[in-house]
UniProtKB/Swiss-Prot annotation, chain B:
Provenance organism: Thermodesulfovibrio yellowstonii (strain ATCC 51303 / DSM 11347 / YP87)
Single GO MF descriptor: NADH:ubiquinone reductase (non-electrogenic) activity
Name used for this protein in its record: NADH-quinone oxidoreductase subunit K
Substrates-to-products reaction catalysed: a quinone + NADH + 5 H(+)(in) = a quinol + NAD(+) + 4 H(+)(out)
Pfam families: Oxidored_q2 (PF00420)
InterPro entries: NADH_UbQ_OxRdtase_chain4L/K, NUOK/Mnh_C1-like
GO CC entries: NADH dehydrogenase complex; plasma membrane
Localization annotation: Cell inner membrane
Family that this chain belongs to: Belongs to the complex I subunit 4L family.
Encoding gene, per UniProt annotation: nuoK
Subunit structure and binding partners: NDH-1 is composed of 14 different subunits. Subunits NuoA, H, J, K, L, M, N constitute the membrane sector of the complex.
Enzyme class: translocase
Topology with respect to the bilayer: Multi-pass membrane protein
Amino acid sequence: MEKYYILILLFPLAGFLFNILIGRFISPKVVSWAGVLSILGSLVVALFAIAQVFSGKTIEYNIYTWILSDDLKVSFGYLIDQLTAVMLFVVCFVGWLIHIYSVGYMHGDPGYPRYFAYLNLFVFSMLMLVMGNNLVMLYFGWEAVGLCSYFLIGFWYHKKTASDAGKKAFIVNRIGDFGFALGIFLLFINVYALNYTDIFPKIPGLQGHTLNIFGWNIDLITLIALLLFCGAVGKSAQIPLHVWLPDAMEGPTPVSALIHAATMVTAGVFMVARLNPIYGMSEIALAVVAITGAVTSFFAATIALVQRDMKRIIAYSTISQIGYMFIGCGMAAYGAGIFHLYTHAFFKALLFMGAGSVMHAMAGELDIYKMGGLRKKMPITYITFLIASLTIAGIPGFSGFFSKDEILWAAFASAKPYGKFIWLLGTITAALTAFYTFRILFVAFHGKFRGTPEEFKHVHESPPIMTVPLIVLAIGSVIVGYFSIPHFLEPVIPKPVFAAPHEQERVVMTMSIIAGVTGILIAGYIYIVKSTVSARLAKTFSGVYKVLWNKYYVDELYSFLFVKPTLWIAEKFIERFADIKIIEGIVNGIPKLIYKTGLLIRPIQTGQLQQYAIFMIAGIIIFVLIILNI
Amino acid sequence: MIPLSWYLLLSATLFSIGLIGFVIRRDLIVMLMCLEIMFNAVNIAFASFSYYNSNLTGQIFVLFSIAVAACEAVIGLAIVLALVRNTGINHSDEIVNLRG
Amino acid sequence: MNPLIEQVFYVYFFISLTILSIAVIASKNIIHSAFFLLIFLLHVAAIFLFLNAEFLMIIQIIVYVGGVLALFIFAIMIMNIKEEFRHKRFVKFSIAGLITGFLFLAGLYIFLGTVKSPENVLIKSDVNSLGKLLYSYYFLPFEILSLVLLIAMIGGIIIAKKTPFDREGK
């Protein structure tokens, strides 16, 4: 039975091959059926696996030994334990819903087969990432999802902004992946194993080992954990490698929903949770993770306050929420982090798909200040969007409340000195989150329409193929919070240690509810009751507003520090000097040399018969003389 | 008694003169005649070897040599004829089509 | 035969053959060259006679003089070579040719000075034993030679044929 779980991986791969090879020659209907059915097949088999895991079993199976060389044994195998089961459910279920949504969203697009092929390839890569039982499969899936992200962000490659965004995503990802690879190498050198089950018992033995770099002794486990975290920073768009995610909104909206909300960007969190024995042994690494997460979440939330592009606001919201997940992991409450990952997949995908629905109705317009009063014409979209916004704001009863609360309680109650500070930052961010999410809701769906009447006439509710997934996700957003993931994950994820009495949990809960409600009320006041306040606020704090609007000028900073010098070196030095002079000199010079030599030798052939005869005789004489002398 | 080396010297002299003539003259037909001189020099050498080793093999070889020389003269003259007919050139230093 | 007479005849042949061959290669007129070649061939036939090879002498006269030389004369006649006024006889690089040739000759002389001369010479040779040798030991080369002659005949005809282009027009 166990070996059939490879079908979870094979179905999307088959879908990819089918659509990329012959998708062009068949009708779009067949393409969409192939794409959706492959993921459905994965989901069904995954449900079987999850059922087995529910009964307490862990599935491990090696399919094929890839590299077998002395100490290095790398195999394709999968490990399905509770953590993998959670991720499997998220990827397959949300992925399936998004495939169905895409059928309606991408209808009529000329690249239809290519889209579904890449989407299937992405699901395959993500599944390989979560199901792998060794670091090599993790890395393989890691790189592959980055690649698919590049494909899908730059899907409409004729647009320069889209292809630039794809390149940016891939390059920034690569920078993180470099650290990730170094971490894997360092780990391998010290434990000589790559399977999780082989590595984890050996980690305690590495405690206290140090690595000598330029005279400083750095603790080995901390170094490994930090290097691995580099990859997570790149993949999950935390500071300082967050710059690719807002630009990634150039891709189709279902792509944003799947990749940049539910699955790929959460791979970093999954990695930290999966490798928690390593992180658990290094206080410094955990601190770095937590503080990075906290700072990122606050930082991204502030940017989201003033943006006008609906998808961009939701993108910054994603960055902020992943920051929460890293806060959870950094506080050694990995279960809470994964729990938030799980609920976040539902409500964030819902937000993105709602935005896609609005885009569909507004003929591609995304500026919320060009919309307004849409709730009358798009009731289903409005209600699902409302549910998602309530969830993200942490209103009790919805799933976001449970997961966010776990994280904030873990931050508050941890024994670490910075715990309370992170809790404070997290609570303020929760208020900001509620504010900007309801800002979208109130500006776009309430009030009066700010465009022309013809556009308003065009606004319509999306077809059922797009709204049914919205409804399913909305239902999910509400109910999944009641299933306690951290409890489910206990066999593989250690429970956090709480240093505060349990009664204070109520206080923390109340504080976060107050923060959320405050955010909603302020947003309501500014955008519904008195709609001139926002303009006045912008003018009064114009300096702050400008910085926030320009995203703290991070892109410009990177362009100045890294991009322009690299381009300068490439053009001036490499192109002018090394390429033209040296390499082309050699490549052109060798034929020239041969030619000149040939020109020198050419006059020997005169075409005169008797001259050849003289040469022959001379040759014979010399030859005979040589023989006779010997 | 004339020693063998004298006949061989005679053959060598005739051969060299034929060789020099082949390399020097411009006329194609004279070149072919010089080839004939060379052939005859070699025949003399073979015949003298046959005489001095009292072995008839040398004479058989001269027979073959004469026959082959005749064939070669035929073909050579045919080629020269075709050349002169097609290009009007009958001097060897004007035929330089195979120049490098 | 008297050794002295032999030596006189040898000296005569040496000088005459040398002068004749030089005359062949140095004549201005091609017909003169051809006739010098004729006398040369007859002298060579005489040498064959000296070497007790009468059959070779006859064959030499019949084939070479009567066949090859006649062919040369016919070819010269057919080609209709117009004698240009003061056309050059020698190629430009004749000096190099002369030097190489002399070197060759010098090399041969040095080498051939060391050849030893055996004592027992051929007393007489007759066609009978020549024929026996030809048809037993050297039968294969004999047959192949017949093929060669056939091919040379065909080849000569084909190469020297007048093409239809040559027939008309010119």
